[in-house]
From Swiss-Prot:
Species: Clavibacter sepedonicus (Clavibacter michiganensis subsp. sepedonicus)
Gene Ontology CC terms: cytosolic large ribosomal subunit
A GO term for molecular function: structural constituent of ribosome
Post-translational modification: One or more lysine residues are methylated.
SUPFAM superfamilies: Ribosomal L11/L12e N-terminal domain, Ribosomal protein L11, C-terminal domain
InterPro entries xrefs: Ribosomal_uL11 (IPR000911), Ribosomal_uL11_bac-typ (IPR006519), Ribosomal_uL11_C (IPR020783), Ribosomal_uL11_C_sf (IPR036769), Ribosomal_uL11_CS (IPR020785), Ribosomal_uL11_N (IPR020784), Ribosomal_uL11_N_sf (IPR036796)
Protein name (record): Large ribosomal subunit protein uL11
Length: 143
């Protein structure tokens, strides 16, 4: 087994799928760690091509020799909720002004998609987390 490389940095970014380019905010974030920005952009765009339109969080691990690896996460819950509810953004005053409604089936569907990244043991717990996020955005969840 090859010797372990020393990690020098961990960068977390949220980038639109298939739309990574060296312009800010990506360029400066990677540049200060000495990563080849174009190489990352090409690799990220190739891996997220099928998910165009979504925002995909990525965790980039930078090593001492300036190489990097990255892990793609699932889209943020808020983005998935907005897409399912068909709204552009959540409510400015979530507890007084409701902007949309979601059914429990839609919430469960989002929970299944997010299950890997959520701190939940089963789908019911994951659905509760998603429902809470929806409520905080001014979207009512119907049972």
């Amino acid at each position: 087994m090859a010797p372990k490389k020393k990690v020098t940095g961990l960068i977390k970014l949220q980038i639109k799928a298939g739309a990574a380019n060296p312009a800010p905010p990506i360029g400066p974030a990677l540049g200060q760690h000495g990563v080849n920005i174009m190489e990352f952009c090409k690799a990220y765009n190739a891996q997220t091509e099928s998910q165009r339109g979504n925002v995909i969080p990525v965790e980039i691990t930078v090593y001492e020799d300036r190489t990097f690896t990255f892990i793609l996460k699932t889209p943020p819950a808020a983005e998935l909720i907005k897409k399912a509810a068909g709204v552009a953004k959540g409510s400015g005053t979530p507890h007084t002004v409701k902007v949309a409604k979601l059914t429990m089936d839609q919430v469960r569907e989002i929970a299944e998609q997010k299950q890997a990244d959520l701190n939940a043991n089963d789908i019911d717990a994951a659905a509760k987390i998603i429902a809470g996020t929806a409520r905080s955005m001014g979207i009512t969840v119907e049972a």
